[in-house]
Amino acid sequence: FGESCAVGLRVEPGAEELLPLNLVGCSNDIELRRFLNSRRIPKNRAYVERILAPFGLRASDTKGIIDVTKGMSLNDPYCVVPAGEGPCFAEYNLFGNSFDTVLSVIAYTGRIPSNQVGSGIPSELSPSGSFPKTWRVVDDRRVLYKAAHDDGLGLEPVSEYLASQVAAAMGLPHVAYDLDVW
């Protein structure tokens, strides 16, 4: 999946409508490479090296990240598998499987818990953005926890919360934010 590497896209006949829109009718690998690169953790993400360390990966290792996560994300239902490998959504989807709680702690705090072994699906290898964040399951709901950068004033979460409150007061469509301590 490197810059000089071409990869092929094979779609089951009749399943073309299930592709991401930018891949429908795609005749070259540029859009496929862009899509696959979007399925990995950003290189500027807080604690990126620590998040990837348990898997022996680097942020630029798109193929390695796809191999671990099958390209799954909480943003959509796409699953990326090698040719010949069976369907994987039920086994790897982040909506119906538990998350790796140790990895969640690393992604949110940068601290590696001692004497703990991770289990579950790694949900931290695809969220975009550079701020510390992690997905958690709270009361059977997937909830994104975001933190501020250590090097800033720490007001980013407060800003998102206040913007959400302003949008609600104005009657605008918005994503509801709340403040919490974890």
Q: Language-model segments: which ranges?
A:
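Conserved ATP-binding subdomain of kinase catalytic cores across diverse folds
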Residues: 96-182
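P-loop NTPase switch module centered on the Walker A-proximal segment
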Residues: 1-114
